[in-house]
Amino acid sequence: MQTLGKTLNMPLYRGLSNGRPESNRSDAKATLGPCGLFQCFLRPFRVAGSARLSRQMLALLVVAVALPAQAGLAIQSWTAKSGTRVLFVESRSISMLDVAVDFDAGGRRAPAGKAGLAGLTNGMLALGSTGLTESQIADQFADTGAQRGARADQDRSAITLRTLSSSAEREAALALLATLLQNPSFPEEALNREKARAIAGLKEAETRPAAIADRAFSRAMYRSHPYGASASAESVASISRADIVAFYQANFSARSAVVSMIGDISRSQAEAIAEQLTAGLPAGVAPAVLPPVGVPDPSPIRIAHPATQSHILLGMPAMARGDADFFALTVGNYILGGGGFVSRLMNEVREKRGLAYSVYSYFAPLKEAGPFQIGLQTRKEQANEALKLVQGVVADYVAKGPTAAELKAAKDNLAGGFALRIDNSRKILDNLAVIGFYGLPLDYLDQWVANVERVSLADVKSALARRVKPAEFAVVVVGAPE
């Protein structure tokens, strides 16, 4: 189960969105804090009494693997009367409906000193509404057999819903979701409980080298930019109910929202659902223009820790969502450190020298320049050697680019595995949300393989030269050799 991510505002969205292979995500930074409000994945079912509802819940559980891989997705898009952008895929293969409502209400929108506010606000939406207690909300979702989820990253906050598409269950689940989105009560008692839970998790995380490294790396990479802010026990403790109400009123508006849907409904039904979910949202305010992402602090950060291994992170802000270099960098990263055992870093660091069990690299594009990150763990006495080796491998790769054989293997693997990235409704929903929120072309998924196959050696080399500058890398070593 996904835990409290990068201290309430880590990137929790998955799928093909960042060009990083699903099979190489052992480094996912889901390490800080207890399970609870801020988990990416949907809450488990509460047990319902009737055999009919039990069968409905079984259908919900199997739907994630029952949808065949699809080619040529017919994505429909329009703007609702409320001003919300809507993306919809009609899918009649299973009697289900998946919905996501994404808001421009990620961690970057939190005021200075209030890191964690975005995730806390998002999670609190389901803990009380006008005329409904937390327990009543949970019971009503259980009665319909629906699943509700919450997720957040630096850019977005979202609520998700999975329900049967039959009229009674669908209408009840959507009515409840609309109530949560439009009339949250943010009860003080629930807020205090969730703050205490989060603070306990954050304090525990402060003892773990992976969490310490992640926080220090974000700060070194983004300095004072909002992307570099990580929640702390102090920042969460400072969040009041008034802060949450103000953040909700300012950022959870129809004009900042994107509604994504896939399922067994018609276009006209989808239009009505989008209006139902967004018509009563706050008016919101025009989002503040964020400062540009600057150059990282290149001074290596070495933090003592009693752990037997050193945790090493290095990288820099590199690429925004929709960047023209995305596909060249996706292919290039697969060769460098995204391809598991066939990557250069794995070959040099693990296979040839045995300095680490695993080493990875990835790009995570955001609204502004998202991180390019390399990570590994190694024994303390080997940390300096491993870091120097990684820096050398990256510098050589950026200078010379890949070989023709590496390029072909990477493109074949990425193109051949693409179908697995959209083989169920949940994955498709995640990608619809990415397309809608970041304004990507509607044929983005249809053209993904062709765009990968179009990448040349020159494309990779020139993109790396523009986006990956080893001399500017932020470097963090936790558990540094003494």
Regions found by a protein language model. Give the residues of each.
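Short, low-complexity, charge-dense intrinsically disordered segments
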Residues: 8, 17-22, 26-46, 51-54
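Cleavable N-terminal signal peptides
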Residues: 57-59, 69
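N-terminal signal peptide c-region/cleavage motif recognized by signal peptidases
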Residues: 64-68
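N- or domain-start disorder-to-order transition segments that initiate the globular core
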Residues: 71-95
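M16 family metallopeptidases and their MPP-like homologs
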Residues: 89, 94-122, 134-179, 195, ...
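An aromatic/glycine/proline-enriched structural segment found at the starts
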Residues: 227-228, 254, 258-322, 477-482
